[in-house]
Amino acid sequence: MADKLGAVREFDQERAEAAVRELLIAVGENPEREGLLETPARVARAYREIFAGLHEDPTAVLNKTFSEDHQELVLVREIPIYSTCEHHLVPFFGVAHIGYIPGESGQVTGLSKLARLADMYAKRPQVQERLTSQIADALVDKLGAQSVAVVIEAEHLCMGMRGIRKPGAVTTTSAVRGGFKTSMASRAEVFALIRGN
């Protein structure tokens, strides 16, 4: 699957295993010792799963809709997300809040599709800002939503376990589209609901 960020090749298990083996050697480890013998294969399999979103298409995730003639907010809060910082290849994790108002057709998608959409984009080398925008844009482009609000709150291990070492710090990003972008009252309402007020 390729998108505007560039072409994506199929996962290469053998190449991934060789790269992990070389990394172990580069950091001073012995990949032949008992505890590390299977590590290259294990890490490669884990990365196949962790980065599975590179090979998924948002159109396939949002392909099933229902005609409910619903013109009001649909909001799913506190969807757990796990992603990988593209700068350091360490995890960031937290929750996504995804809300939308259907387009004029009143088409809605299943609630689980919102979680699947978040997972699909999270399972890539990512930055939180892009992840937030990709989810919002997919709901506009693929579902035809007239208004979208996405908020992600996440802890980044690249900040917690290395560098500045501030574990527990939470980064919040938002992306608003349509009416939530143009109407301050609508934006305030959806953000209050996201906060649980």
Curated annotation (Swiss-Prot):
Pfam family, one: GTP_cyclohydroI
Keywords attached to this entry: GTP-binding, Hydrolase, Metal-binding, Nucleotide-binding, One-carbon metabolism, Zinc
Subunit structure: Toroid-shaped homodecamer, composed of two pentamers of five dimers.
Uppermost EC category: hydrolase
SUPFAM superfamilies: Tetrahydrobiopterin biosynthesis enzymes-like (SSF55620)
Sequence similarity: Belongs to the GTP cyclohydrolase I family.
GO biological process assignments: one-carbon metabolic process; tetrahydrobiopterin biosynthetic process; tetrahydrofolate biosynthetic process
GO terms for MF: GTP binding; GTP cyclohydrolase I activity; zinc ion binding
InterPro entries the UniProt entry points to: GTP-CH-I_C/QueF, GTP-CH-I_N, GTP_CycHdrlase_I, GTP_CycHdrlase_I_CS, GTP_CycHdrlase_I_dom
Gene3D superfamilies named among the record's database cross-references: 1.10.286.10, 3.30.1130.10
EC code: 3.5.4.16
Taxonomy, superkingdom: Bacteria
Protein name: GTP cyclohydrolase 1
HAMAP family named in the record: FolE
Recorded catalytic activity of this chain's protein: GTP + H2O = 7,8-dihydroneopterin 3'-triphosphate + formate + H(+)
Cellular component GO terms, alphabetical: cytoplasm
Pathway it works in: Cofactor biosynthesis; 7,8-dihydroneopterin triphosphate biosynthesis; 7,8-dihydroneopterin triphosphate from GTP: step 1/1
Binding site for Zn(2+): 85, 88, 158
